[in-house]
C-alpha cells in the first residue's frame, strides 16, 4: 500500500492548528487586531517587510530612507505590548517549524550522508 504523503501533511496541518503554539499566535493576533494603534503599527511593519523582500528578490537596493523608516517602525513595535506578545508567539511557532523541517528532510539527509 502506497503512503499518501498529502494525507499525512493534512494531519500535520490539523495538529498544528490544535497546537498551543498556534493558539498562542491566534490569541495574540486577536489582541493586536482589537487595538487600533497596534494593528496599524503591525500592518505598516508587515508592509515594509514585504516591500524589502520583494526588492531583495529583484536585486534592488534598499534606500537609506526606507531603512530608517523600518528602524523607526521596529522601535515602535518593540514598545507595543500586544505586538511583542505576537512576535514571541511567532518565534515559538518558528522553532516548531524548524524542528518539523529537520524531521521531514531527515530521509534525504541520510541518502546524501555518505
Swiss-Prot record:
Domain of life: Bacteria
Pfam families xref list: Com_YlbF (PF06133)
Gene3D superfamilies: YheA/YmcA-like
InterPro entries recorded: Com_YlbF (IPR010368), YheA/YmcA-like_dom_sf (IPR023378)
Family, per entry: Belongs to the UPF0342 family.
UniProt cross-references to HAMAP family, sorted A to Z: UPF0342 (MF_01526)
Protein name, per record: UPF0342 protein Sca_1419
Species annotation: Staphylococcus carnosus (strain TM300)
Upper lineage: Bacteria, Bacillati, Bacillota, Bacilli, Bacillales
Amino acid at each position: 500500500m502506497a503512503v499518501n504523503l498529502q494525507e499525512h501533511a493534512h494531519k500535520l496541518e490539523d495538529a498544528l492548528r490544535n497546537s498551543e503554539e498556534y493558539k498562542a499566535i491566534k490569541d495574540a493576533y486577536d489582541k493586536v487586531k482589537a487595538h487600533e494603534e497596534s494593528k496599524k503599527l503591525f500592518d505598516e511593519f508587515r508592509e515594509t517587510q514585504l516591500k524589502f523582500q520583494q526588492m531583495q528578490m529583484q536585486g534592488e537596493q534598499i534606500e537609506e530612507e526606507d531603512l530608517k523608516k523600518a528602524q523607526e517602525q521596529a522601535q515602535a513595535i518593540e514598545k507595543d505590548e500586544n505586538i511583542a506578545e505576537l512576535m514571541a508567539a511567532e518565534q515559538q511557532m518558528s522553532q516548531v517549524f524548524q524542528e518539523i523541517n529537520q524531521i521531514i528532510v531527515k530521509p534525504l539527509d541520510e541518502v546524501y550522508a555518505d
